């Protein structure tokens, strides 16, 4: 996959004709510098998106959305072509998913002095856990908790503010996202254990079955060839792994 591959493939002929693939990202897959406004995209996503564009032989265009729900709307409206998204059963009726590309650990960020040391410590009456509404990490946690209360915000920054201002006792999300925010809250800790993992796949509109088949092939090729592992290494993030192959028996 080191060289561009011009594709004479009917499954993605529309993308080749357009000369670009529009990859949608949602917060916190990208961030804006508050001073310069410069966009920073998670390296592992950017590198994998570039590899897809190279395989297609087209330009890569990154589009910004605030939430996963807005990305799904964009996919089905045709305003974007592909996205990276956790393959949750609640989303499967709206978009089509490739096999997983990445596996991302879910855990908690807790403030200085917190008595929460392990995941199990947080599931108690009276404990408030901040979450981003409709994120895969939230959907997973909502199925696991028996006693703690979820406190919702729409995007990562206001979710962090719930923790920072004492309106929540922990924040549940992807580990490397929490690591970045931890630097903004002195004494805070990201727990070492996890309550699950995000199997991050590539998503397309349900109406594009051919495109999905093509992208699923790309994903398996990228995992097997080391492209995904190299993208992870370039990003240097903790708690991020290459997802297992979709068909382990086919790997040599």
Protein language model regions, located:
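Ligand-binding clefts/hinges and TM-proximal coupling segments of bilobed small-molecule sensing domains
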Residues: 2-6, 11, 136-153, 190-191, ...
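Short helix-initiation/N-cap motifs at beta->coil->alpha
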Residues: 46, 61-73, 117, 151-165, ...
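Alpha-to-beta junction loops
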Residues: 21-22, 58-59, 76-85, 126-128, ...
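Ligand-binding cleft/hinge of the Venus flytrap
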Residues: 32-38, 49-59, 98-99, 123-125, ...
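Periplasmic-binding protein-like
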Residues: 27-28, 102-113, 175, 179-220, ...
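A ligand-binding cleft/hinge motif common to bilobed small-molecule-binding domains
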Residues: 69, 86-94, 140, 164-196
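Extracytoplasmic small-molecule ligand-binding "clamshell" domains
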Residues: 3-86, 91, 225, 234
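Flexible hinge/capping segments at coil-to-helix
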Residues: 110-129
């Amino acid at each position: 996959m080191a060289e561009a591959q011009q594709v004479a493939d009917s499954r993605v002929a529309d993308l080749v004709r357009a000369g670009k693939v529009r990859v949608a990202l949602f917060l916190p897959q990208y961030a804006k510098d508050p001073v310069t406004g410069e966009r920073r995209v998670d390296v592992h996503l950017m590198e994998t998106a570039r590899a897809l564009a190279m395989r297609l032989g087209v330009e890569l265009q990154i589009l910004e959305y605030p939430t996963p729900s807005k990305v799904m709307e964009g996919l089905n409206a045709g305003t974007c072509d592909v996205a990276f998204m956790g393959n949750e059963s609640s989303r499967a009726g709206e978009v089509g998913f490739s096999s997983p590309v990445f596996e991302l650990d879910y855990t908690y960020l807790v403030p200085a002095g917190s008595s929460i040391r392990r995941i199990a410590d947080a599931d108690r009456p009276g404990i408030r856990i901040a979450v981003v509404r409709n994120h895969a990490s939230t959907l997973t946690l909502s199925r696991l908790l028996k006693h703690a209360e979820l406190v919702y915000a729409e995007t990562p920054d206001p979710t962090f503010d719930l923790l920072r201002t004492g309106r929540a006792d922990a924040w549940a999300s992807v580990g490397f996202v929490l690591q970045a925010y931890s630097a903004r809250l002195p004494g805070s800790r990201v727990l070492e254990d996890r309550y699950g993992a995000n199997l991050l796949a590539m998503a397309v509109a349900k109406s594009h079955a051919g495109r999905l088949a093509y992208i699923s092939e790309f994903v398996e090729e990228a995992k097997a060839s080391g492209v995904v592992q190299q993208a992870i290494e370039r990003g240097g993030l903790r708690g991020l792994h290459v997802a297992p192959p979709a068909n382990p028996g086919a790997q040599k």
